[in-house]
Swiss-Prot record:
Name of this protein: Succinate--CoA ligase [ADP-forming] subunit beta
UniProt binding sites for ATP: K46, G53, R54, G55, E99, A102, E107
Native species: Burkholderia cenocepacia (strain HI2424)
Cofactor info, note text: Binds 1 Mg(2+) ion per subunit.
Pfam families (UniProt xref): ATP-grasp_2, Ligase_CoA
Assembly: Heterotetramer of two alpha and two beta subunits.
C-alpha cells in the first residue's frame, strides 16, 4: 500500500524526523488559507499523487506570493499529471500539499528497503539526491552506499554517522543526520513498511538537515495490525479493478496487453505470463484466484477481465493441487454464461479431478479451446487473440 507525501511526513514527525511545516489542501481556497497560516515569504505547492517525478511533470511549484500560491494551486489541482511513473494517461491531482520554502544547499538521498537477496534490511544513501535513484544506480553505482541493519540492534550510531559522512553531510550536521536516519529506521520497522525513502534529504546553508520529501510503501499483509496506516489509504489513487478484485480475495494487477489470464498460484501466474510473451502475446492482467477459488470467485474474475476494452482472449491455466479442476470447470462454465463471454477462451487444467473437469467443459456446449500443456495453451491463446 502506498500513501501520499504529506501522510509520510506525518509519520516521520511522530518518529522525530525534522520536516518543513506544511499541510494538505483539497481546494484552491484551502491552499491559500494554509499558505497564510504558514507565513511567507516562500511556499511550495505540491501535487499529491502516488507517483514520483512530480516536479518534472509540472506538479511542484515554488510560490513567492499568496497570489502565486492561488495561481499554482489553480493550475495543479484537478490536472492530469503525467510523470515517468504514471504512464501516458497520467494521474488526476485531487489534493495538494502547501509547505514552507526551504534553503537548499545539498540534496541527498536516503532510504530503507528489504533486500531480498541478503534477506536483510538495508539503509541506502547517496550524495545524488533530488534525482531518480534508479538512474543514479545505473550510471553511477559507486555513488550509492549501503548499510545492513540488524533488527536486534537497530541502526547503530556508528552506522548512521558513517553513512552520513559518506554521502556528504558536513561534520557539524552529522548528529542531526543521525537522528533523522534512526527516526526513519524506527518508522520503517514499527509500521511494517517495505520502503521508507527521503528524497531529497536537505542540508541548508546554515547546516540544518530536513526531509523535503517522504515516500512510504507498506506490506499489505501486515496492514491488519496497523489501522492507523489503513486510514491513510486513498482509493482514488488505486486501480478500480484492483479494488474490486480485493473484495473477492482475488490478487489482480492490470497490465497493458490484450490476453486475460486466470491462474491459481502467483508462481504459475508469472510463468503463464512469461510463456504468453514467449510466443508473442501480451498479458492484460495478473490474476491469481488462489487455492480456495469458488464458482463466485471465478465468475467475478471473468467480470473483471471483461471490463478491459482491449481484451481479445482469455487463458485459464489451473494446476489442481488444493484447488480441484472440477470446481474450476464449474466456475468457468458459470462465469462464461453469466457474462455472455464473447472472446475466445483457452483452458488448460492439470491435477486433482482433471478428467472430470475436462469432461464438464466438453459437455458444457461452450466454445472452449482445450490445451494439455502450458506451451500449447499459450500458443493457442496468442493465435486466438490475433484472430487466427
Amino acid at each position: 500500500m502506498k500513501i501520499h507525501e504529506y501522510q509520510g511526513k506525518e509519520i516521520l514527525r511522530k518518529f522525530g524526523v525534522a520536516v518543513p511545516r506544511g499541510k494538505p489542501a483539497f481546494s484552491v481556497d484551502e491552499a491559500v488559507k494554509v499558505a497564510e497560516e504558514l507565513g511567507g515569504p516562500v511556499w511550495v505547492v505540491k501535487a499529491q499523487i502516488h507517483a514520483g517525478g512530480r516536479g518534472k511533470g509540472g506538479g511542484v511549484k515554488v510560490a513567492k506570493s499568496i497570489e502565486q500560491v492561488r495561481e499554482y494551486a489553480n493550475q495543479i489541482l484537478g490536472m492530469q499529471l503525467v510523470t515517468h511513473q504514471t504512464g501516458p494517461e497520467g494521474q488526476k491531482v485531487n489534493r495538494l500539499m502547501i509547505e514552507e520554502g526551504a534553503d537548499i544547499k545539498q540534496e541527498l538521498y536516503v532510504s530503507l528497503v528489504v533486500d531480498r537477496i541478503s534477506q536483510k534490511i538495508v539503509l541506502m544513501g547517496s550524495s545524488e539526491g533530488g534525482m531518480d535513484i534508479e538512474e543514479v544506480a545505473e550510471k553511477h553505482p559507486e555513488l550509492i552506499h549501503k548499510v545492513i541493519v540488524e533488527p536486534s540492534t537497530g541502526l547503530l550510531d556508528a552506522q548512521a554517522d558513517d553513512l552520513a559522512a559518506k554521502i556528504g553531510v558536513p561534520a557539524a550536521s552529522i548528529p542531526q543526520a543521525r537522528a533523522i536516519l534512526q527516526g526513519l529506521y524506527k518508522a520503517f520497522w514499527e509500521t511494517d513498511a517495505s520502503l521508507a525513502e527521503i528524497n531529497p534529504l536537505n542540508v541548508s546553508g546554515d547546516g540544518k538537515v530536513t526531509a523535503l520529501d517522504a515516500k512510504f510503501n507498506f506490506d499489505s499483509n501486515a496492514l491488519f495490525r496497523h489501522p492507523e496506516i489503513v486510514a491513510y489509504r486513498d482509493l482514488d489513487e488505486e486501480d478500480p479493478a484492483e479494488i474490486e478484485a480485493s473484495k473477492f480475495d482475488l490478487a489482480y494487477i492490470s497490465l497493458d496487453g490484450n490476453i486475460g489470464c486466470l491462474v491459481n498460484g502467483a508462481g504459475l501466474a508469472m510463468a503463464t505470463m512469461d510463456t504468453i510473451k514467449l510466443f508473442g502475446g501480451e498479458p492484460a492482467n495478473f490474476l491469481d484466484v488462489g487455492g480456495g477459488a469458488t464458482t463466485e470467485k471465478v465468475t467475478e474474475a471473468f467480470k473483471l477481465m471483461l471490463k478491459n476494452p482491449d481484451l481479445k482472449a482469455i487463458l485459464v491455466n489451473i494446476f489442481g493441487g488444493i484447488m480441484r479442476c472440477d470446481v474450476i470447470a464449474e466456475g468457468v462454465i458459470a462465469g462464461s454464461k453469466a457474462v455472455n463471454l464473447n472472446v475466445p477462451l483457452v483452458v488448460r487444467m492439470k491435477g486433482t479431478n482433471e478428467d472430470l473437469g475436462k469432461k464438464m467443459l466438453a459437455d458444457s456446449g461452450l466454445p472452449i479451446i482445450s490445451a494439455d500443456s502450458m506451451e500449447e495453451a499459450a500458443q493457442k491463446v496468442v493465435a486466438a487473440a490475433a484472430g487466427k
